[in-house]
Amino acid sequence: MAPESLVEVPGCNCFWYLGVLAAAWWGLRAACCLLNGARAWVLGSGAQVGPRIGKWAVVTGATDGIGKAYAEELARRGMSIVLISRSPEKLDEAAKHIKETFKVETKIIAADFGKPTEIYERIEAGLRDLEIGVLVNNVGVSYEYPEYFLEIPDLENTLDKMININIMSVCQMTRLVLPGMLGRGKGVILNISSASGMYPVPLLTVYSATKAFVDFFSRGLHAEYRNKGINVQSVLPFYVATKLAKIRKPTWDKPSPETYVRSAVNTVGLQTQTNGYLPHAIMGWISTSLVPVSVAISMGMKMNKGLRSRFLKRKKQK
């Protein structure tokens, strides 16, 4: 009888090989992530974005935050800018600043994407005959504060508004601009989603779902049209110091819109789905690769319950 230490345990070789394969797989994934990261964050220059793909860039939600920063960055790269937003006064001010600072042409179209009746006919007329190289679908709206679905103030109107602004505007603006890009065989569409669309976020459920739509729509559209010269990118920022996020002072992980956009534009052509900014990319990798979705949802619920309580407490004190 063979000594116990020499007895072969059935299947032990199989488990060893499985372990080696798993380690090799994770090693390969890590290497690919590092390689793609270096390509985007070190070598990226956004060379695909500029007047050579079309004279004009169209930016929705162009008078504040990330939209304004995209308009200015594209103007800095030599593109003429069509600014679309709700307030004619803020549009005039933003257009004047861009024209004087970057010496490019500007055009403004006042439109309230929350009230879509007939606005797309007006936008289509305003864009007619323009050589549009870049479309930035940025306009968006979120909750005033985290809230349970059935307790959202003015729920019916809020749903209509959020779906019209966050989803329908992306589809409709793409419908208007994409044919011209296809006709020339080149163009870039940048759809601003959110890190909230990477996994469900309780108490921001509708907003999170609309941003997940933008991400899926972008990636599907890119697969449909990439062989025809069209580059569609889904941009998923974490917190940026904007009015929408209610953050006033930029930090390393909550950058100014200008810092964020300068970084994000450099990833165009290198990443079809991007968090746009290196610290955000690290947070995105951790939250989707290392943290189980169930844990991310639980953490989101806990954080937003705290934010909700603090908001309602302040409101009651007023």
From Swiss-Prot:
One of its GO terms (molecular function) is estradiol 17-beta-dehydrogenase [NAD(P)+] activity. Pathway: Lipid metabolism; fatty acid biosynthesis; Steroid biosynthesis; estrogen biosynthesis. SUPFAM superfamilies: NAD(P)-binding Rossmann-fold domains. Its EC number is 1.1.1.330, 1.1.1.62. PROSITE patterns: ADH_SHORT (PS00061). Substrate binds at residue 194. It is found in: Endoplasmic reticulum membrane. InterPro entries: NAD(P)-bd_dom_sf, Sc_DH/Rdtase_CS, SDR_fam, VLCFA-Steroid_DH. Catalyzes the second of the four reactions of the long-chain fatty acids elongation cycle. This endoplasmic reticulum-bound enzymatic process, allows the addition of two carbons to the chain of long- and very long-chain fatty acids/VLCFAs per cycle. This enzyme has a 3-ketoacyl-CoA reductase activity, reducing 3-ketoacyl-CoA to 3-hydroxyacyl-CoA, within each cycle of fatty acid elongation. Thereby, it may participate in the production of VLCFAs of different chain lengths that are involved in multiple biological processes as precursors of membrane lipids and lipid mediators. Belongs to the short-chain dehydrogenases/reductases (SDR) family. 17-beta-HSD 3 subfamily. The chain crosses the membrane at residues 15-35, 187-207, 281-301. One of its GO terms (cellular component) is endoplasmic reticulum membrane. It catalyses: a very-long-chain (3R)-3-hydroxyacyl-CoA + NADP(+) = a very-long-chain 3-oxoacyl-CoA + NADPH + H(+); 17beta-estradiol + NAD(+) = estrone + NADH + H(+); 17beta-estradiol + NADP(+) = estrone + NADPH + H(+). The active site is at residue 207. Pfam families: adh_short. GO terms for biological process: estrogen biosynthetic process; fatty acid biosynthetic process. The keyword Transferase does not apply. It is a multi-pass membrane protein. NADP(+) binds at residues 54-83. The keyword Membrane applies. Keywords: Endoplasmic reticulum, Lipid biosynthesis, Lipid metabolism, Membrane, NADP, Oxidoreductase, Steroid biosynthesis, Transmembrane, Transmembrane helix. This is Very-long-chain 3-oxoacyl-CoA reductase-A.
